Amino acid sequence: MANRWVGVTVDCIDVERVSAFWSVLLDRPRGPSEPGWVYLGHRDDPQPRLVFQPVAEPRAGKVRLHLDVSVDDIDQGIAQVIGLGGRFTGERHDYDEGVVVVMTDPEGHEFCLSQFY
C-alpha cells in the first residue's frame, strides 16, 4: 500500500478570510472546494493542499502542529503577514543557519517564518 501526505486541514470560524490570507502568503490558488470549505491546491498537486474547514467556535489552548514558511527576507515576510491581517508574536529565534519568527494568521493560528542564510 502506498501512502501519501495530501494536505493539512485548518479549522476556522471565517473560512473565507483565513483562506484568502494563506492564498496570498503562499501564492496558492483556490482549487475546487466543497460548500462552506475552501481548498488551496488540489489533492493531485505535487505540493500538499491546505483545506479550510468551518467550525462554530475557536479552540481553546495551543495547537500542537504548525506550518513553517520559508521567506527570502524575514523583515519583508513579517511586513507581508501583518499587511494581510496576521500578527508577529514577538518571538524570534536566531540560529547559525538563519532566523525563525513566530507569527499568527487572522484567527490566531501560529506558524513560523524562516529565513535561511
Please provide the spans of the model-predicted regions.
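Vicinal oxygen chelate
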Residues: A2-I13, G31-P32, Y39-Q53, E57-Y117
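Amphipathic alpha-helical segments
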Residues: D14-P29, V81-I82
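Short alpha-helical
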Residues: R17, Q47, Q76
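Basic side chains
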Residues: R17, R28, K62-R64, R92
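Short, conserved, surface-exposed binding loops centered on an aromatic residue
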Residues: R30-G31, R59
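Short connector loops at helix/strand junctions that flank enzyme active sites
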Residues: P35, D45-Q47, A60-R64
